[in-house]
């Protein structure tokens, strides 16, 4: 009788052991399946992201076809004695061109310090600035801090001239990615001085003045080099 009980107990323990083993194998199989699924999902998302990013880049303007110079300048009319009698300028073209040599070095340094302090160090995009802005956006929900370099701003104003009509975040992100891509390409073929000169002749400085020379005339009634 005891042997019968012992045999039954052994069978019961064997069944429990097998059941436990099968449960453990099922859990291991589930974990493996979950792990493989997560890897596949990550690969899929990565491929989708790369494909989307490539599509955005492929649709960007060709760097050889763009012009980073300002789009409009003021026109002056003179009488037969050479005296200026009238100034003609569209609302967004009140601009008087000057060379970088005519712009005081102190003004150049001030603009760089405010707009893009690592202008002479980066290759068109400021990775540190992008990371800083990203961290601030994630931690505080504040997306107001920009990370656009002087080169990017120049492209925004002189190449992506329709940015003011953007109505969706997708349009803004698409343009921003294209700006970053083109900024790197532009800096491969254009020196920093040329970029800065065009920027200082482009920027809107208020009161209808575009560029530092127009602003000097507008606010101080003198030339920027005076």
Enumerate the language-model features and the residues they cover.
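N-terminal type II signal-anchor transmembrane helix
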Residues: 1-78, 118, 138
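Peptidoglycan glycan-strand catalytic modules in the bacterial/periplasmic cell-wall system
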Residues: 2-7, 72-74, 78-226
